Amino acid sequence: MKTNQVKKSSSFHTNIVSVLNSDAFQTRMRQVLPDFLRAERIAGIAITELRNNPKLLQCDVLSLVGAIIRAGQLGLDIDSIKGHAYLVPYKNECQLIIGYKGMLTLANRSGKLLSMEVQEVRENDDFEIEHGDNYGLRHKIKPRRSERGSIIGFYAYAHLANGGKMFEYMDQDEINEIKACSKSSNSYNSPWVTFPIEMAKKTVVRRLCKYLALSP
């Protein structure tokens, strides 16, 4: 990296960190955050994400701040390790991408769910789908993942508060089609690249939530 590029990156970092630590940003975050999240912690996590993903330093400051505030409004953690939500650079804009754990969190808040299970299906698993009177899934796996083979699909299975149940299954080809529609899916720092299984789970959860008319 050339000297002037280093200086420019350092300047962006200083400006963004100053914004995140400013009284105006902290006040705004306190206005939108739920009680279980603290503005200072969110700012600290955002700064850590900037250090871990320097491409974020090239994003427009307003788009970055907007993505952080949006995550706060949703009550989602932006720590990429936790998988609730991700800050993803695309060109010079920062996008907020909700992970499957974040999608589950939003769905659970609806009050319509008792629980939701999300699993990958591998080629050597004993897996069956039944519709009609015996509507449901049957999924048995081998104890060692090395014996299960390659991933062939994913499912989300919801137990509803009204006593009902509903599931959605997507094979790997369907997941890949959804991935291809994401503008930043092939970027090296996209969660589709760094957390592919989590993003696939998020995709099937999101589709099921649409059928259930839940908030995600």
Spans of model-derived segments:
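Binding-interface segments
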Residues: K8-S215
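Structured, charged N-terminal subsegments at the starts of enzyme catalytic cores
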Residues: K2-K7
